[in-house]
């Protein structure tokens, strides 16, 4: 759903009602995993994908029907081997898609949120369409009309969040079986770049295309020009310590130091290598990396902390241009 937020705003602006479909189960080979979403308006416009080929057309019709009746529905699409290639299922199979007449506000908040969250929805059984939101702390926001094991739901949501994989499961209640769909929204990955040079300008659009929220920081105003970084999520004019403090480094941060200047890189590394960031890398040759590590030891960093540093970074393609690096 996160990749459809711009389309969501576009559809809202039309004033036309629109609904959503999300893949809840896949059997066989499929190009779109559980959690893949699609939006469709009442007049047939679509955004996103749940599979390919005729499944999209059929799903759009199901969304239109859900809008008309104002109720959700779990739909099963079975694909024969003969039609498999047409819809992108290399070996045939079955797809289950949950169709809703509108996008829930909680779902939108989860998709927009920076912290990890899981939407848990009833896709079959009593309470069809009801949902709660489970935060990465395990706290549950919202409630179901039927008594469900909330502790077990919180635990299952946490496990799905750690795997970063949406999934469905059946839960037995006093009134019968209920099928829940755990739609995972991991922490939004952030690429933090310090050093707004040519390589940074080439890296930002690539990272954005891969789904990263990009942040470019530099203490030199002349380099931090918005025209050079039209696709950057944020530009921060600050030196490393201040920039990282403002960003709030966490386990969803991937840090690339591209300044090529020890007086900027080393203070930044001292903070970054002691942070919970998932990745810390610095540009520079193998020779530069050796001397850099020695200076980091002199600054008091431990071998374990220094061992987190990736370098040289970039691809050794034999190229010289920023985009090639």
Model-based region annotation:
Residues 241-246, 316:
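Short loop/turn elements that flank and shape the SAM/SAH-binding pocket of Class I
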Residues 97, 277-278, 282-325:
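Adenosine-phosphate binding glycine-rich loop
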Residues 1-219, 227, 236, 245, ...:
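Segments forming oxygen-rich coordination pockets for charged ligands
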